[in-house]
Amino acid sequence: MKWRANMKFCDMPYQRIDFAEAKKELNALMEEFKRAEDAEAQFEVHKKYYKLTDKVSTQITLASIRHTLDTTDEFYEKEQAYYDEKVPEYSNLLIEYQKQLYHSPYRKELEKKIGPVAFKNMELAFESVNETVIPLMQEENALTTEYEKLLASAKIEWNGEILNLSLLGPYLKSKDPKVRREACEKQNEFYLSIADKLDEIYDKLVKNRTEQAKLLGFDTYTELAYRRMQRNSYGQEQVEALRRQVKEYWVPFSESLYEKRKRRLNLEHLYFSDEQVYGPEGNPQPSGSPEEILAQGQKMYCELSEETKEFFDFMMENQLLDVFGRKSKAVGGYMTYLPDYHAPFVFANFNGTSGDVDVITHECGHAFQGYLSAKDPIREHADIGMETA
């Protein structure tokens, strides 16, 4: 894949998207699409659409990544707030273009090029967004960003150190029950200190999403959420059947495992602080420092195949894995994608637990998919459903 240009993440230039200019470009594409006289000409316009949306997506994603890398950075906090407001309007513009594509007189030929799943996903998108819900989508974005920053603000005192939620993780899984209990209490103290704010955000989100669903013609938010998650081949009935089977078969099995764990830990009662520990000697621990774990991950991917070696070397060379825990980082982990650089990006918070190894397989598995699909000229093919998360 020599076509893929190398650029370190820190060197990727950021420029705020001018959505008025993006709208102008998109409107010009829609006019050109209308004038196109056959499927081939319309597909050439669609390739220009890819280029425009890749440019916009790259800058939005750069801002989002850099905001989560340091939630105290005022510049990227403002950029995130800007996109929280502007992206819903932009998403609605994209729907207008997609409607032209969907209703093209050359639909059959275009479907052969782009694939039928893309058109099915367009149907779901048409039902998920319109102008009436844009203000609510803007509010929803602001609330989720506020929630993310609230969790990242944790400053938990622990043996003379100040830890965030991610860095407290190892103590929640300590083999010493007293340490586990104390860590849980410290974590709970933090959540209780922000309980009123959490309740407020949750209440606003429930009301917001319910109102969005009603405005779009649904009885509940569940129906809207299925469409936004691109559940294009099954519905609520199938999920309800799965839940019944989980309750009937998996819950009793899970309870039996908890009973075995209680005996293994020599406990009369399994408390909430014991739920993350599997044996009296504690959980399996990754061997080595965070840097050594990452190096071992690179060795593993090098040995798997030529493709995985090429992928992980690319990620390492271009600093596309920011996985070491820091106090100002957002909580959790994710993989995202920077289309202009054909580059996946992995975010995580290594904290010395087995979760560090999970990142090397789970999030890097997503990144490998993104890396491989980057060469596919049909961008819709990279648009995988939520089931793969």
Language-model-detected regions and their locations in the chain:
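Short beta-alpha connecting loops at secondary-structure transitions
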Residues: 345-349, 376-385
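A well-structured
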Residues: 2-284, 296
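Short, hydrophobic/aliphatic alpha-helical segments
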Residues: 198-210, 318-319, 345, 371-375
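Active-site recognition of the HExxH zinc-binding catalytic motif
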Residues: 351-373
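Secondary-structure transition/capping motifs at alpha-helix termini
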Residues: 303-312, 367, 371-380
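Auxiliary, metal-adjacent structural segments of Zn-dependent hydrolase domains
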Residues: 280-341, 353-354
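Conserved catalytic alpha/beta cores of large enzymes that bind or transform nucleotide phosphates
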Residues: 258, 378, 389
